[in-house]
Amino acid sequence: MEISSAGPVGAQPLLMVPRRPGYGTMGKPIKLLANCFQVEIPKIDVYLYEVDIKPDKCPRRVNREVVDSMVQHFKVTIFGDRRPVYDGKRSLYTANPLPVATTGVDLDVTLPGEGGKDRPFKVSIKFVSRVSWHLLHEVLTGRTLPEPLEPDKPISTNPVHAVDVVLRHLPSMKYTPVGRSFFSAPEGYDHPLGGGREVWFGFHQSVRPAMWKMMLNIDVSATAFYKAQPVIQFMCEVLDIHNIDEQPRPLTDSHRVKFTKEIKGLKVEVTHCGTMRRKYRVCNVTRRPASHQTFPLQLENGQTVERTVAQYFREKYNLQLKYPHLPCLQVGQEQKHTYLPLEVCNIVAGQRCIKKLTDNQTSTMIKATARSAPDRQEEISRLVRSANYDADPFVQEFQFKVRDEMAHVTGRVLPAPMLQYGGRNRTVATPSHGVWDMRGKQFHTGVEIKMWAIACFATQRQCREEILKGFTDQLRKISKDAGMPIQGQPCFCKYAQGADSVGPMFRHLKNTYSGLQLIIVILPGKTPVYAEVKRAGDTLLGMATQCVQVKNVIKTSPQTLSNLCLKINVKLGGINNILVPHQRPSVFQQPVIFLGADVTHPPAGDGKKPSIAAVVGSMDAHPSRYCATVRVQRPRQEIIQDLASMVRELLIQFYKSTRFKPTRIIFYRDGVSEGQFRQVLYYELLAIREACISLEKDYQPGITYIVVQKRHHTRLFCADRTERVGRSGNIPAGTTVDTDITHPYEFDFYLCSHAGIQGTSRPSHYHVLWDDNCFTADELQLLTYQLCHTYVRCTRSVSIPAPAYYAHLVAFRARYHLVDKEHDSAEGSHVSGQSNGRDPQALAKAVQIHQDTLRTMYFA
């Protein structure tokens, strides 16, 4: 794939994505199955038409109905036996040309509307171009490179898009599409999530070019939908009201606000007009009940009078409201004052929930959807058999054949790196199945903790003093064994309550105890105190804090205490372990910096909050210590706006820490989807170069830019059941695939670096978009796998390289720094970080880390 910016063609050099340098050979071969199904495509040209539908603001579902009706209606004159496929927007493909003039043709189509009224549409169809699947074969076999992709060239002319539309046409008519997945209403199963939401199961389907062939990627998927039910019931679920008839009083303000937040933006249909089930979108909930909410009603004589909603429904529909004390829904446009009593409305079926799930809903969702690998494999196979693609008339029209067995792939299990610990006996740990153990080992570099404090935000009743004493004794014992001795008793140990007491207490500690190294904070479950502790510690005062849930203080376990020590040692400047130096790839022979970058976006439907960009960089040769930079930027912007200055900061810090200038920069970029590769690479690669040149005009280290993706639907299964690992029967940690299901000629690979605990492991996908350092496949795959073993929070290999993981933690922590005490009700379950009326400067300042914290791994 070529990269070009959106400027005029030729104004900027085209960035050519590197070709695959060869295949990896390291590791023990393993036979795998992938949830990819081969699609045989004929070597023909297909015909692309542009479809223009007026009115043009219709949802795709309506557009599809219009086009479907048009094909039926104009069968004799235009379409004959042809079965066109349509993408729901502007593109229509046919296997044979249509008899329409080059200028196009305008057609009138009507759909039956609600309540017997017809809905008229005007449709124009115009020939655009032929799309060649000959060429696709040439590209897939690597015989020809595709022509450089011009950024302004429409996706519809892309032959892969045409294949996708053919395979999507029928399911789009039968099911509810969401992104690349299809869902249908639950039949015979019921998975309520609470709060008016439920789980719908469906499947993901996407077409991807692979080596020598096109593959159809099929996976089972699940998402949250709103339950189709009366609005009164929806309200009861949201507000935890068990019996509406026992609520004779109007809603409290807090109840009304909560209900409004949940129902705003949803579609409802009315039930008081017989078969006329008119639909409306909710824009608000009234403050007043139906018995008091008035609106101006125009009488037949032209006079306007004020009527309450309850009166109006009694007079007009002879309907005595059962719940006149409840508020009304305001629907349609705010300024139009259309009010509906709750009791005449139902939630429209098939609305996907895009709002963030609560913690309870998320855990219910995971329980309902987690499948062991063998179960998922079986489910996907069943799905493909029942989809019966070869019987799909549109698939037949374009002469496709879809195989119904999974692709056989040979992967390799890479060897795990050994990890060097410290202490007198300098033990080495060898991971087995992605896990190792710290028992009998001491940190590579342990910190001695001489001055420390405890602040307990749980009540004295929850956590008595002797419980605290027991906890600190246990912690000191474990920490001594780990080579991080905590000396003596804490210099300060007090109970406190509420987020407001955090600042004053921390200030007192900072001023009273010079040389204080750590504050251990005990929290009573989910609480706004956490955000305030991190805001005060990380940004205002520069003090190291370690939070512990009170349940883990009351009931200590060696595992929990040991995990606490892993975090504390690193926050105070220690090193837990390092990769054994002699087995590291050759890239370590010269100074190299590893960068990890991520952008986290606010939850859907939250227009006000900024996106947060984080970049971390390694600060030593192991690499074990990292330094962080973080910025706020425009909501939903994927490109890291301020990357040049962030990388510059990290390069300066690297030089201060090591006295070397890196000769290589390895950049792991998380969270970019395929559609954004081009513009993100173009902007960010130049930003990294700019950072280097701003330090010295001839400083040009080699840059390798790798995108890490976890959000994809490729799953790998062991073909041989004896190779399955663990209770959930997954592929072993270290499984790598770079053939068959990967890109025809670009440098990408799948690596499952972690041991699956629950459900089916998802391998991470790595795509090299730039490589000045000329890595071989083996070198880069091994380097990536080794970096997955350097994550300090646990003694297991994680699913993405440590620098990418740390960037994610830094961005996530910044959300807490943005929680504004004055404006936010920082409800435990939702880190809000609202930018309520705060200007960009204030937001930027809120995420700025204190000078004393900047050099530490405060995010661990």
UniProtKB/Swiss-Prot annotation:
The keyword tRNA-binding does not apply. It is an enzyme of class 3 (hydrolase). Keywords: Cytoplasm, Endonuclease, Hydrolase, Metal-binding, Nuclease, Ribonucleoprotein, RNA-binding, RNA-mediated gene silencing, Translation regulation. Gene3D superfamilies: 3.40.50.2300, paz domain, Ribonuclease H-like superfamily/Ribonuclease H. The keyword Nuclease applies. One of its GO terms (cellular component) is cytoplasm. It comes from the Eukaryota. SMART domains: DUF1785, PAZ, Piwi. It holds the Pfam family ArgoL2. Disulfide bonds: none annotated. It is found in: Cytoplasm, P-body. Residues 518-819 form the Piwi domain. Its EC number is 3.1.26.n2. GO terms for molecular function: endoribonuclease activity, cleaving miRNA-paired mRNA; metal ion binding; miRNA binding; RNA endonuclease activity; single-stranded RNA binding. A divalent metal cation binds at residues 598, 638, 670, 808. GO terms for biological process: miRNA-mediated gene silencing by inhibition of translation; mRNA catabolic process; pre-miRNA processing; regulation of stem cell proliferation; regulatory ncRNA-mediated post-transcriptional gene silencing. It catalyses: Endonucleolytic cleavage to 5'-phosphomonoester. Residues 230-349 form the PAZ domain. InterPro entries: AGO3, ArgoL1, ArgoL2, Argonaute_Mid_dom, Argonaute_N, PAZ_dom, PAZ_dom_sf, Piwi. Residues 530-567, 758-805 are annotated as: Interaction with guide RNA. Transmembrane segments: none annotated. Belongs to the argonaute family. Ago subfamily. Required for RNA-mediated gene silencing (RNAi). Binds to short RNAs such as microRNAs (miRNAs) and represses the translation of mRNAs which are complementary to them. Possesses RNA slicer activity but only on select RNAs bearing 5'- and 3'-flanking sequences to the region of guide-target complementarity. This is Protein argonaute-3.
